[in-house]
Amino acid sequence: MDWDLFLKIVDDISSYNPNAFIQLFFVGEPLLHARILDMIRYLKQNNLRVHLATNATILDETMAHGLINAGLDHITFSFEGTDKETYESIRINAKYESVLENIFRFLRIKGQEKAHIHTVIEIIEMAAIKDKIPDFIKKFDGLPVDQIRIKTFLGWAGTVDESKMAVKTYGTPNYPCNRPWRMLAITWDGLFLPCCVDAGRKYVMGDAHRDSVEDIWNGEKIQYIRKKLNTGNYSEIELCKNCNDIEALSERFTFPEINADHAGST
């Protein structure tokens, strides 16, 4: 993302919602950005909470110290596979032992510096590794990990075939997905999307170069999605009809209260 665009977006968010929780990643590896530490520092200067998710392939000692010293609040390590064979078949050109050591080193530094960074290890539950997960979790015994999360395979709104990899779940949720009530996604080039699952940009709602967060948050396009989800009409939204990542209502990440006209109430 262009630096000036980043500054505009952050200033816009901090003005509209000073309690926002910023997830500084979207369909890419955030540590590849040359100014990632500057981004975190600027967000913290604006008193915003910052979460970063990384695959840790390039997380060296210098970057580990940098993330901690920049004031990062939350970090999630995405690890695809519990053993060398599975991991390296998915994360091409990455080395299982090296990436694990990157994570272990970060955790050791976190402990040494007594850093208050909420730390999550995230594993996708796949049929091939389901029985190996307990042994993998034991690798983190004694290290300052706050949570080890086993995630359902995400089909990215129907764009990825999960049939050969995922542990199957069945049924239709009896609650509306909460994402359009608690978040917006912004692409590297400034496009507003209703949620982070829209990697294919199926439902562009505006452009951060010209539109404000407040206008998009209360705009007609996101209102339409909220109303459809609130009545269970997932099939009427192209983005949502094949999504397997529907979430129950949560207050973990919130925007300011939406007034009744914008809430999609029935």
Predicted features along the sequence, with ranges:
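Short secondary-structure boundary micro-motifs
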Residues: F6-K8, L72, V167-Y170, G190
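Radical SAM/AdoMet-radical enzyme domain recognition
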Residues: M1-F140, D146-K151
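Short, small/polar residue-rich loop motifs at catalytic or cofactor-binding pockets
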Residues: N178-P180
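Short, acidic, Ser/Thr-enriched surface-loop or helix-capping motifs
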Residues: I186-T187
